Amino acid sequence: MSFTARQIGAPNTLDYRVFIEQNGKPVSPFHDIPLYANEEKTVLNMIVEVPRWTNAKLEISKEEKLNPILQDTKKGKLRFVRNCFPHHGYIHNYGAFPQTWEDPNQVHPETKAKGDNDPLDVCEIGEQVGYVGQVKQVKVLGVMALLDEGETDWKIIVIDVNDPLASKLNDIEDVETHLPGLLRATNEWFRIYKIPDGKPENQFAFSGECKNKKYAEEIINECSEAWEKLIKGETADSKGISLDNTTLSSTQTFSEAAASGVPPASVQPAAPIDKSVDKWFFISGAH
């Protein structure tokens, strides 16, 4: 199954969109791409939204048809993540699992908080820097439970199956063995990254502990089941999410015509970013 990215417009602009294609036909990264890449369910598909070390806050659109990747905005302005010393931009290749949904209508029994209404967030910790719209095949290692402004915001830790270390990383304890300091730095980054924007420090459930692979797989299953209900129209409130898809013919929102509404690719060079995005922020008590 081959996926490619269709870029429309210039990065760092309000009009920038990245659609995902399967064999040249636009599909929804939220609904059409299978969660699992193999029958054994040991390899999963991940959509890269934000490549490591970049600042633009890119995300799968929940509201637009076929859910293209776009840059988030606040009060009409493009959003960028600040550089919290010693980090630059996002600490990992950051993205989402398709066919998952953190249901905001449900309170998780252990975090005591509702889902954040997004696909499951994924941090890919391999050595290669990804690209926007890349569909990576990954294996699951563990999960952190961020409590972001009162919502449960799971962060699944994964490794690209083609990474040189992939065969040695099979559960969360292997990460500390082969990549010492990575989990601590990841915890720190998620804790502090909103502080430069005037927001409070984020909190974690489980005292910041990164839970193991088995626990992570349970969370993935829960969010996969929540998405199944969403796409079938069985949820109490779908929160305005576009459910249009081009491959799930048994769903009411199946529409092959949706693909024809996607503009052709128009790759343009990135627009310049304001120099303020390069600033380093030094946060007391971060380390």
UniProtKB/Swiss-Prot annotation:
Its main location: cytoplasm. One of its GO terms (biological process) is phosphate-containing compound metabolic process. Its cofactor is Mg(2+). The keyword 4Fe-4S does not apply. Gene3D superfamilies: Inorganic pyrophosphatase. It comes from the Eukaryota. Its EC number is 3.6.1.1. It catalyses: diphosphate + H2O = 2 phosphate + H(+). Keywords: Cytoplasm, Hydrolase, Magnesium, Metal-binding. Belongs to the PPase family. This is Inorganic pyrophosphatase. It comes from Debaryomyces hansenii (strain ATCC 36239 / CBS 767 / BCRC 21394 / JCM 1990 / NBRC 0083 / IGC 2968) (Yeast). The gene is IPP1.
